[in-house]
Amino acid sequence: MEAFVSRFVDRVTIHVAAGDGGNGCASVHREKYKPLGGPDGGNGGRGGDVRLVVDPGVHTLLDFHHRPHARASNGKQGRGSMRNGAIGEDLVLPVPEGTVVLTPDGEVLADLVGVGTTFVAAQGGRGGLGNAALSSKARRAPGFALLGEPGDEHDLVLELKSVADAGLVGFPSAGKSSLISVLSAAKPKIADYPFTTLVPNLGVVTAGDTVFTVADVPGLIPGASEGRGLGLDFLRHIERCAVLVHVVDCATQEPGRDPLSDVDALEEELARYTPALKTEHGAGDLESRPRLVVLNKMDVPEARELAELVRPELAQRGWPVFEVSTASHEGLRELRFALAEAVEEYRAEQPEPEPARTIVRPVGVDDTGFTVEPDPDYEDAFIVRGDKPERWVRQTHFDNDEAVGFLADRLAKLGVEEALAKNGAKPGSQVTIGSVTFDWEPSTPAGVAGVLGGRGTDLRLDQDERVSAHERKAAKKARRTSLDEEGGYVGE
Protein backbone atom coordinates (compact mmCIF):
# COMPACT_ATOMS: atom_id res chain seq x y z
CA MET A 1 0.00 0.00 0.00
CA GLU A 2 1.36 3.42 -0.96
CA ALA A 3 2.44 5.53 1.99
CA PHE A 4 0.44 8.68 2.72
CA VAL A 5 2.17 11.89 1.70
CA SER A 6 1.10 15.19 3.21
CA ARG A 7 0.02 17.85 0.75
CA PHE A 8 2.43 20.22 2.49
CA VAL A 9 6.07 19.37 1.85
CA ASP A 10 8.74 21.79 3.06
CA ARG A 11 11.99 19.85 2.53
CA VAL A 12 13.00 17.77 -0.48
CA THR A 13 16.16 16.53 -2.19
CA ILE A 14 16.24 16.88 -5.96
CA HIS A 15 18.63 15.95 -8.76
CA VAL A 16 19.05 18.56 -11.49
CA ALA A 17 20.87 18.01 -14.78
CA ALA A 18 21.41 20.70 -17.39
CA GLY A 19 21.42 19.92 -21.10
CA ASP A 20 24.59 18.91 -22.94
CA GLY A 21 26.05 21.20 -25.57
CA GLY A 22 25.66 20.17 -29.21
CA ASN A 23 28.63 18.96 -31.22
CA GLY A 24 30.28 21.19 -33.79
CA CYS A 25 30.11 20.25 -37.46
CA ALA A 26 33.07 19.52 -39.75
CA SER A 27 32.03 20.19 -43.33
CA VAL A 28 33.40 21.76 -46.53
CA HIS A 29 31.57 24.30 -48.66
CA ARG A 30 30.43 22.74 -51.94
CA GLU A 31 29.21 24.91 -54.79
CA LYS A 32 29.50 24.85 -58.56
CA TYR A 33 32.47 26.80 -59.90
CA LYS A 34 33.90 27.14 -56.38
CA PRO A 35 36.49 24.41 -55.88
CA LEU A 36 38.02 24.15 -52.43
CA GLY A 37 35.27 26.30 -50.91
CA GLY A 38 36.74 26.04 -47.45
CA PRO A 39 35.31 24.92 -44.09
CA ASP A 40 31.70 25.90 -43.31
CA GLY A 41 30.75 23.76 -40.31
CA GLY A 42 28.55 25.52 -37.73
CA ASN A 43 28.88 25.49 -33.95
CA GLY A 44 26.80 23.31 -31.65
CA GLY A 45 24.05 24.89 -29.55
CA ARG A 46 24.39 25.50 -25.81
CA GLY A 47 22.57 23.10 -23.52
CA GLY A 48 19.54 24.30 -21.58
CA ASP A 49 19.81 25.52 -17.97
CA VAL A 50 17.76 24.32 -15.00
CA ARG A 51 16.30 27.36 -13.23
CA LEU A 52 14.39 27.73 -9.98
CA VAL A 53 11.97 30.68 -10.16
CA VAL A 54 9.85 32.08 -7.33
CA ASP A 55 6.19 31.71 -8.32
CA PRO A 56 3.43 33.30 -6.17
CA GLY A 57 1.03 30.54 -7.21
CA VAL A 58 3.16 27.77 -5.64
CA HIS A 59 2.98 27.23 -1.88
CA THR A 60 4.68 23.88 -1.18
CA LEU A 61 7.44 21.65 -2.55
CA LEU A 62 5.05 18.75 -3.12
CA ASP A 63 5.71 18.53 -6.88
CA PHE A 64 9.41 17.88 -6.23
CA HIS A 65 8.50 15.07 -3.82
CA HIS A 66 6.78 13.19 -6.65
CA ARG A 67 9.24 14.22 -9.39
CA PRO A 68 12.68 14.73 -7.83
CA HIS A 69 14.61 14.45 -11.12
CA ALA A 70 14.77 17.38 -13.52
CA ARG A 71 16.70 17.57 -16.78
CA ALA A 72 16.89 20.33 -19.38
CA SER A 73 17.09 19.66 -23.11
CA ASN A 74 20.36 19.30 -25.02
CA GLY A 75 21.70 21.73 -27.58
CA LYS A 76 21.48 20.72 -31.24
CA GLN A 77 24.42 19.78 -33.42
CA GLY A 78 25.89 22.32 -35.83
CA ARG A 79 25.37 21.84 -39.56
CA GLY A 80 27.01 22.80 -42.81
CA SER A 81 26.66 26.18 -44.55
CA MET A 82 27.59 27.96 -41.31
CA ARG A 83 24.38 26.86 -39.57
CA ASN A 84 24.72 26.81 -35.79
CA GLY A 85 22.79 24.30 -33.72
CA ALA A 86 19.70 25.39 -31.78
CA ILE A 87 20.12 26.30 -28.12
CA GLY A 88 18.59 23.81 -25.70
CA GLU A 89 15.41 24.97 -23.97
CA ASP A 90 15.80 26.00 -20.34
CA LEU A 91 13.83 24.03 -17.76
CA VAL A 92 12.02 26.40 -15.37
CA LEU A 93 10.96 24.93 -12.02
CA PRO A 94 8.52 27.11 -10.01
CA VAL A 95 9.18 27.23 -6.27
CA PRO A 96 7.36 29.04 -3.44
CA GLU A 97 8.70 32.26 -2.00
CA GLY A 98 10.99 31.57 0.94
CA THR A 99 12.71 28.55 -0.61
CA VAL A 100 16.31 28.04 0.51
CA VAL A 101 18.65 26.08 -1.78
CA LEU A 102 21.37 24.05 -0.05
CA THR A 103 23.98 21.46 -0.92
CA PRO A 104 23.61 17.99 0.63
CA ASP A 105 26.30 19.11 3.13
CA GLY A 106 24.17 22.04 4.30
CA GLU A 107 25.93 24.90 2.48
CA VAL A 108 23.44 27.64 1.58
CA LEU A 109 23.55 28.46 -2.14
CA ALA A 110 20.58 30.80 -2.45
CA ASP A 111 17.69 32.24 -0.44
CA LEU A 112 14.85 32.87 -2.88
CA VAL A 113 12.73 35.77 -1.68
CA GLY A 114 10.80 38.02 -4.05
CA VAL A 115 8.51 37.07 -6.92
CA GLY A 116 10.53 36.34 -10.06
CA THR A 117 13.83 35.74 -8.27
CA THR A 118 15.72 33.12 -10.26
CA PHE A 119 18.46 30.68 -9.28
CA VAL A 120 20.41 28.86 -11.99
CA ALA A 121 20.62 25.42 -10.38
CA ALA A 122 22.55 23.83 -13.27
CA GLN A 123 24.16 25.50 -16.27
CA GLY A 124 23.98 23.97 -19.72
CA GLY A 125 27.11 22.73 -21.43
CA ARG A 126 28.80 24.85 -24.07
CA GLY A 127 28.39 23.83 -27.68
CA GLY A 128 31.39 22.55 -29.61
CA LEU A 129 33.02 24.75 -32.24
CA GLY A 130 32.59 23.84 -35.88
CA ASN A 131 35.55 23.67 -38.25
CA ALA A 132 34.68 27.12 -39.64
CA ALA A 133 35.27 28.66 -36.21
CA LEU A 134 38.50 26.66 -35.81
CA SER A 135 40.01 27.88 -39.07
CA SER A 136 42.80 30.44 -39.04
CA LYS A 137 45.73 31.56 -41.16
CA ALA A 138 47.77 28.68 -39.80
CA ARG A 139 44.89 26.17 -39.96
CA ARG A 140 42.92 27.03 -43.08
CA ALA A 141 41.05 23.75 -43.60
CA PRO A 142 40.37 21.92 -40.31
CA GLY A 143 39.06 18.44 -40.88
CA PHE A 144 37.52 18.18 -37.42
CA ALA A 145 35.18 19.93 -34.98
CA LEU A 146 34.91 20.02 -31.20
CA LEU A 147 32.40 18.03 -29.19
CA GLY A 148 29.84 19.73 -26.97
CA GLU A 149 30.45 19.82 -23.22
CA PRO A 150 28.17 18.00 -20.77
CA GLY A 151 25.86 20.13 -18.64
CA ASP A 152 26.16 20.56 -14.88
CA GLU A 153 24.63 17.90 -12.65
CA HIS A 154 23.89 18.37 -8.94
CA ASP A 155 21.99 17.06 -5.96
CA LEU A 156 20.28 19.94 -4.15
CA VAL A 157 18.22 20.25 -0.99
CA LEU A 158 15.24 22.62 -1.05
CA GLU A 159 13.89 23.96 2.24
CA LEU A 160 10.77 26.09 2.50
CA LYS A 161 10.61 28.76 5.18
CA SER A 162 7.25 30.47 5.29
CA VAL A 163 7.33 34.18 4.51
CA ALA A 164 4.91 35.48 7.15
CA ASP A 165 4.85 38.75 9.07
CA ALA A 166 3.71 37.23 12.37
CA GLY A 167 4.20 33.73 13.74
CA LEU A 168 1.92 32.08 16.29
CA VAL A 169 3.85 29.79 18.64
CA GLY A 170 2.55 27.81 21.56
CA PHE A 171 1.95 24.40 23.07
CA PRO A 172 -0.29 21.90 21.29
CA SER A 173 -4.03 22.68 21.67
CA ALA A 174 -3.31 26.25 22.82
CA GLY A 175 -5.79 27.55 20.25
CA LYS A 176 -3.43 28.79 17.53
CA SER A 177 -5.45 27.36 14.66
CA SER A 178 -8.67 28.76 16.11
CA LEU A 179 -7.01 32.16 16.47
CA ILE A 180 -5.78 32.30 12.87
CA SER A 181 -9.21 31.19 11.64
CA VAL A 182 -10.93 34.18 13.32
CA LEU A 183 -8.19 36.68 12.47
CA SER A 184 -8.20 35.74 8.78
CA ALA A 185 -10.12 33.67 6.24
CA ALA A 186 -7.84 30.65 6.72
CA LYS A 187 -9.59 27.34 7.35
CA PRO A 188 -7.13 25.15 9.28
CA LYS A 189 -8.08 21.82 10.80
CA ILE A 190 -9.32 22.38 14.37
CA ALA A 191 -9.89 19.67 16.99
CA ASP A 192 -9.54 19.18 20.75
CA TYR A 193 -6.47 16.90 20.71
CA PRO A 194 -2.73 17.69 20.57
CA PHE A 195 -0.89 18.03 17.26
CA THR A 196 -4.04 18.59 15.24
CA THR A 197 -1.98 21.00 13.15
CA LEU A 198 0.74 19.05 11.35
CA VAL A 199 1.63 21.66 8.73
CA PRO A 200 1.97 25.46 8.91
CA ASN A 201 -1.14 27.45 7.99
CA LEU A 202 -0.94 30.93 6.49
CA GLY A 203 -3.65 33.55 6.83
CA VAL A 204 -4.01 37.09 5.48
CA VAL A 205 -5.16 39.66 8.05
CA THR A 206 -6.48 43.17 7.36
CA ALA A 207 -6.34 45.89 10.03
CA GLY A 208 -7.34 49.28 8.65
CA ASP A 209 -5.05 50.00 5.71
CA THR A 210 -2.49 47.39 6.75
CA VAL A 211 -2.50 43.91 5.26
CA PHE A 212 -0.16 41.28 6.70
CA THR A 213 0.21 37.52 6.94
CA VAL A 214 0.12 35.28 10.00
CA ALA A 215 1.63 31.78 10.21
CA ASP A 216 0.20 29.13 12.52
CA VAL A 217 3.15 26.90 13.41
CA PRO A 218 2.48 23.36 14.73
CA GLY A 219 2.64 23.08 18.50
CA LEU A 220 5.98 23.09 20.30
CA ILE A 221 6.88 20.98 23.30
CA PRO A 222 9.96 20.98 25.56
CA GLY A 223 12.84 19.48 23.56
CA ALA A 224 11.54 20.66 20.18
CA SER A 225 14.91 22.29 19.41
CA GLU A 226 16.49 18.85 19.86
CA GLY A 227 14.00 17.11 17.59
CA ARG A 228 11.24 16.09 20.00
CA GLY A 229 7.68 16.24 18.77
CA LEU A 230 7.77 17.84 15.35
CA GLY A 231 11.18 19.18 16.31
CA LEU A 232 13.07 21.32 13.85
CA ASP A 233 10.71 20.41 11.02
CA PHE A 234 8.65 23.55 11.52
CA LEU A 235 10.77 25.82 13.72
CA ARG A 236 12.32 27.09 10.49
CA HIS A 237 8.98 28.65 9.54
CA ILE A 238 9.28 31.34 12.22
CA GLU A 239 12.76 32.47 11.15
CA ARG A 240 11.42 35.14 8.79
CA CYS A 241 8.58 36.37 11.02
CA ALA A 242 8.78 40.01 12.09
CA VAL A 243 6.69 39.40 15.24
CA LEU A 244 6.40 36.32 17.45
CA VAL A 245 3.08 35.77 19.21
CA HIS A 246 2.96 33.47 22.24
CA VAL A 247 -0.47 31.86 22.34
CA VAL A 248 -1.08 30.59 25.90
CA ASP A 249 -3.92 28.31 26.98
CA CYS A 250 -5.32 29.77 30.20
CA ALA A 251 -7.86 26.97 30.57
CA THR A 252 -5.47 24.02 30.56
CA GLN A 253 -6.06 21.33 33.15
CA GLU A 254 -2.68 19.63 32.76
CA PRO A 255 -0.76 19.39 36.04
CA GLY A 256 2.35 21.52 36.34
CA ARG A 257 1.33 23.89 33.56
CA ASP A 258 0.39 27.56 33.80
CA PRO A 259 0.78 30.57 31.46
CA LEU A 260 4.12 31.63 32.97
CA SER A 261 5.72 28.20 32.75
CA ASP A 262 4.41 27.79 29.19
CA VAL A 263 5.95 31.08 28.07
CA ASP A 264 9.25 30.24 29.79
CA ALA A 265 9.35 26.83 28.12
CA LEU A 266 8.66 28.33 24.69
CA GLU A 267 11.35 30.97 25.15
CA GLU A 268 13.83 28.30 26.19
CA GLU A 269 13.18 26.31 23.01
CA LEU A 270 13.54 29.41 20.85
CA ALA A 271 16.81 30.30 22.59
CA ARG A 272 18.16 26.80 21.97
CA TYR A 273 17.16 26.93 18.33
CA THR A 274 18.90 30.28 17.72
CA PRO A 275 22.53 28.95 17.73
CA ALA A 276 21.63 26.27 15.19
CA LEU A 277 19.91 28.93 13.13
CA LYS A 278 23.05 31.09 13.08
CA THR A 279 25.44 28.22 12.42
CA GLU A 280 23.54 26.47 9.64
CA HIS A 281 22.01 29.36 7.76
CA GLY A 282 23.79 32.52 8.90
CA ALA A 283 20.47 34.11 9.84
CA GLY A 284 19.83 36.52 12.66
CA ASP A 285 18.72 35.36 16.09
CA LEU A 286 15.15 35.29 17.39
CA GLU A 287 15.94 37.13 20.62
CA SER A 288 15.54 40.59 19.11
CA ARG A 289 12.14 39.89 17.53
CA PRO A 290 9.27 41.73 19.22
CA ARG A 291 6.90 39.53 21.24
CA LEU A 292 3.21 39.65 21.98
CA VAL A 293 1.48 37.39 24.50
CA VAL A 294 -2.06 36.19 23.85
CA LEU A 295 -3.92 34.73 26.85
CA ASN A 296 -6.47 32.58 25.07
CA LYS A 297 -9.84 31.01 25.99
CA MET A 298 -11.16 33.94 28.05
CA ASP A 299 -14.68 32.55 27.59
CA VAL A 300 -13.84 30.03 30.35
CA PRO A 301 -14.33 31.60 33.85
CA GLU A 302 -11.26 29.92 35.35
CA ALA A 303 -9.14 31.21 32.49
CA ARG A 304 -10.04 34.83 33.21
CA GLU A 305 -9.13 34.46 36.86
CA LEU A 306 -5.77 32.94 35.97
CA ALA A 307 -5.11 35.68 33.41
CA GLU A 308 -5.60 38.38 36.03
CA LEU A 309 -2.96 36.70 38.20
CA VAL A 310 -0.25 36.31 35.55
CA ARG A 311 -0.85 39.45 33.49
CA PRO A 312 1.19 41.81 35.74
CA GLU A 313 4.25 39.56 35.68
CA LEU A 314 4.10 39.16 31.90
CA ALA A 315 3.73 42.92 31.50
CA GLN A 316 6.90 43.42 33.55
CA ARG A 317 8.86 41.68 30.79
CA GLY A 318 7.91 44.49 28.42
CA TRP A 319 5.63 42.37 26.24
CA PRO A 320 2.12 43.54 25.31
CA VAL A 321 -0.48 41.14 26.75
CA PHE A 322 -3.89 40.53 25.18
CA GLU A 323 -6.80 38.56 26.60
CA VAL A 324 -8.83 37.03 23.79
CA SER A 325 -11.50 34.46 23.13
CA THR A 326 -11.80 32.85 19.74
CA ALA A 327 -15.30 31.69 20.67
CA SER A 328 -16.73 35.13 21.59
CA HIS A 329 -14.18 37.16 19.53
CA GLU A 330 -13.27 39.14 22.63
CA GLY A 331 -10.08 41.19 22.29
CA LEU A 332 -9.51 40.29 18.63
CA ARG A 333 -9.78 43.84 17.31
CA GLU A 334 -7.13 45.13 19.73
CA LEU A 335 -4.85 42.20 18.90
CA ARG A 336 -5.30 42.69 15.15
CA PHE A 337 -4.32 46.37 15.25
CA ALA A 338 -1.42 45.73 17.65
CA LEU A 339 -0.02 43.17 15.23
CA ALA A 340 -0.49 45.59 12.34
CA GLU A 341 1.42 48.30 14.20
CA ALA A 342 4.32 45.96 15.01
CA VAL A 343 4.48 44.75 11.41
CA GLU A 344 4.45 48.31 10.06
CA GLU A 345 7.34 49.26 12.35
CA TYR A 346 9.32 46.25 11.12
CA ARG A 347 8.62 47.07 7.48
CA ALA A 348 9.69 50.68 7.96
CA GLU A 349 13.09 49.48 9.21
CA GLN A 350 13.69 47.26 6.19
CA PRO A 351 15.53 48.47 3.06
CA GLU A 352 13.71 48.90 -0.22
CA PRO A 353 13.01 45.53 -1.87
CA GLU A 354 15.39 44.66 -4.65
CA PRO A 355 14.04 43.95 -8.13
CA ALA A 356 13.83 40.35 -9.29
CA ARG A 357 17.34 39.03 -9.77
CA THR A 358 19.05 35.98 -11.20
CA ILE A 359 21.44 34.03 -8.99
CA VAL A 360 24.13 31.97 -10.71
CA ARG A 361 26.40 29.46 -9.03
CA PRO A 362 29.84 31.10 -8.74
CA VAL A 363 32.43 29.91 -11.23
CA GLY A 364 36.17 29.92 -10.60
CA VAL A 365 37.82 33.00 -12.07
CA ASP A 366 41.17 31.34 -12.84
CA ASP A 367 40.74 28.07 -14.74
CA THR A 368 44.13 28.13 -16.44
CA GLY A 369 46.07 26.23 -13.80
CA PHE A 370 46.80 22.52 -13.79
CA THR A 371 48.77 20.00 -11.77
CA VAL A 372 50.77 16.92 -12.71
CA GLU A 373 51.22 14.18 -10.14
CA PRO A 374 52.22 10.50 -10.22
CA ASP A 375 49.42 7.97 -10.50
CA PRO A 376 49.41 6.01 -7.21
CA ASP A 377 47.90 2.93 -8.86
CA TYR A 378 50.42 2.43 -11.67
CA GLU A 379 54.16 2.70 -12.20
CA ASP A 380 55.49 5.29 -14.65
CA ALA A 381 52.02 6.84 -14.92
CA PHE A 382 50.82 10.39 -14.31
CA ILE A 383 47.55 12.25 -13.71
CA VAL A 384 46.94 15.75 -15.07
CA ARG A 385 44.26 17.75 -13.24
CA GLY A 386 42.92 21.14 -14.26
CA ASP A 387 39.79 22.77 -15.65
CA LYS A 388 41.23 23.55 -19.06
CA PRO A 389 42.96 20.23 -19.81
CA GLU A 390 39.94 18.25 -18.66
CA ARG A 391 37.56 20.42 -20.69
CA TRP A 392 39.72 20.09 -23.80
CA VAL A 393 39.75 16.31 -23.45
CA ARG A 394 35.94 16.25 -23.21
CA GLN A 395 35.76 18.30 -26.42
CA THR A 396 38.06 16.01 -28.42
CA HIS A 397 36.84 13.39 -30.89
CA PHE A 398 39.54 10.73 -30.45
CA ASP A 399 38.59 8.88 -33.64
CA ASN A 400 39.93 11.84 -35.62
CA ASP A 401 43.73 12.03 -35.82
CA GLU A 402 43.66 15.72 -36.66
CA ALA A 403 41.49 16.45 -33.60
CA VAL A 404 43.94 14.52 -31.42
CA GLY A 405 46.79 16.55 -32.89
CA PHE A 406 44.91 19.77 -32.14
CA LEU A 407 44.53 18.61 -28.53
CA ALA A 408 48.27 17.88 -28.35
CA ASP A 409 49.03 21.37 -29.64
CA ARG A 410 46.78 22.95 -27.01
CA LEU A 411 48.27 20.92 -24.18
CA ALA A 412 51.81 21.74 -25.32
CA LYS A 413 51.00 25.44 -25.52
CA LEU A 414 49.53 25.33 -22.00
CA GLY A 415 52.75 23.75 -20.71
CA VAL A 416 51.47 20.25 -19.96
CA GLU A 417 54.18 18.51 -22.00
CA GLU A 418 56.91 20.49 -20.27
CA ALA A 419 55.42 19.72 -16.86
CA LEU A 420 55.21 16.01 -17.67
CA ALA A 421 58.87 15.98 -18.72
CA LYS A 422 59.90 17.74 -15.50
CA ASN A 423 58.01 15.14 -13.48
CA GLY A 424 59.90 12.29 -15.16
CA ALA A 425 57.49 11.25 -17.89
CA LYS A 426 59.06 9.43 -20.82
CA PRO A 427 57.74 8.58 -24.28
CA GLY A 428 55.21 5.79 -23.75
CA SER A 429 54.35 6.80 -20.17
CA GLN A 430 50.70 6.44 -19.26
CA VAL A 431 48.96 9.80 -18.78
CA THR A 432 45.40 10.30 -17.51
CA ILE A 433 43.43 13.50 -18.10
CA GLY A 434 39.84 13.42 -16.94
CA SER A 435 38.31 10.13 -18.07
CA VAL A 436 40.86 9.47 -20.83
CA THR A 437 44.14 7.55 -20.46
CA PHE A 438 46.71 7.46 -23.27
CA ASP A 439 50.39 6.73 -23.93
CA TRP A 440 52.30 9.98 -24.03
CA GLU A 441 54.34 10.76 -27.12
CA PRO A 442 55.66 14.33 -26.95
CA SER A 443 54.92 16.56 -29.94
CA THR A 444 53.54 13.73 -32.07
CA PRO A 445 52.25 15.10 -35.38
CA ALA A 446 48.79 14.05 -36.41
CA GLY A 447 46.66 14.43 -39.51
CA VAL A 448 47.09 13.55 -43.17
CA ALA A 449 50.77 13.85 -44.06
CA GLY A 450 50.48 13.56 -47.82
CA VAL A 451 48.09 16.26 -48.90
CA LEU A 452 48.20 18.28 -45.71
CA GLY A 453 51.23 20.17 -44.51
CA GLY A 454 50.87 21.43 -40.97
CA ARG A 455 47.87 20.23 -39.02
CA GLY A 456 44.77 21.92 -40.35
CA THR A 457 46.48 23.33 -43.47
CA ASP A 458 45.85 22.33 -47.08
CA LEU A 459 48.68 22.92 -49.55
CA ARG A 460 46.18 22.93 -52.40
CA LEU A 461 44.81 26.23 -51.11
CA ASP A 462 48.24 27.83 -51.63
CA GLN A 463 48.62 26.57 -55.20
CA ASP A 464 47.49 28.97 -57.93
CA GLU A 465 47.12 26.86 -61.13
CA ARG A 466 44.39 28.87 -62.86
CA VAL A 467 45.41 30.17 -66.33
CA SER A 468 44.84 33.88 -66.94
CA ALA A 469 43.05 35.26 -70.04
CA HIS A 470 46.29 36.70 -71.39
CA GLU A 471 48.00 33.31 -71.05
CA ARG A 472 45.09 31.61 -72.85
CA LYS A 473 45.31 34.06 -75.77
CA ALA A 474 49.08 33.65 -76.00
CA ALA A 475 48.75 29.86 -76.02
CA LYS A 476 46.05 30.00 -78.71
CA LYS A 477 48.18 32.26 -80.87
CA ALA A 478 51.17 29.96 -80.43
CA ARG A 479 49.12 26.94 -81.54
CA ARG A 480 47.81 28.77 -84.60
CA THR A 481 51.32 29.87 -85.60
CA SER A 482 52.53 26.31 -85.25
CA LEU A 483 49.76 25.01 -87.53
CA ASP A 484 50.45 27.64 -90.16
CA GLU A 485 54.13 26.80 -90.25
CA GLU A 486 53.36 23.13 -90.69
CA GLY A 487 51.01 23.89 -93.61
CA GLY A 488 53.55 26.08 -95.37
CA TYR A 489 51.38 29.19 -95.27
CA VAL A 490 53.24 32.45 -94.97
CA GLY A 491 51.30 35.53 -94.06
CA GLU A 492 51.75 39.00 -95.41
From Swiss-Prot:
Residues 6-163 form the Obg domain. Gene3D superfamilies: GTP-binding protein OBG, C-terminal domain (3.30.300.350), GTP1/OBG domain (2.70.210.12), P-loop containing nucleotide triphosphate hydrolases (3.40.50.300). Residues 164-344 form the OBG-type G domain. Residues 462-472 have a biased composition (Basic and acidic residues). Residues 362-442 form the OCT domain. PANTHER family: DEVELOPMENTALLY REGULATED GTP-BINDING PROTEIN-RELATED, MITOCHONDRIAL RIBOSOME-ASSOCIATED GTPASE 2. Belongs to the TRAFAC class OBG-HflX-like GTPase superfamily. OBG GTPase family. This is GTPase Obg. It comes from Saccharopolyspora erythraea (strain ATCC 11635 / DSM 40517 / JCM 4748 / NBRC 13426 / NCIMB 8594 / NRRL 2338). The gene is obg.
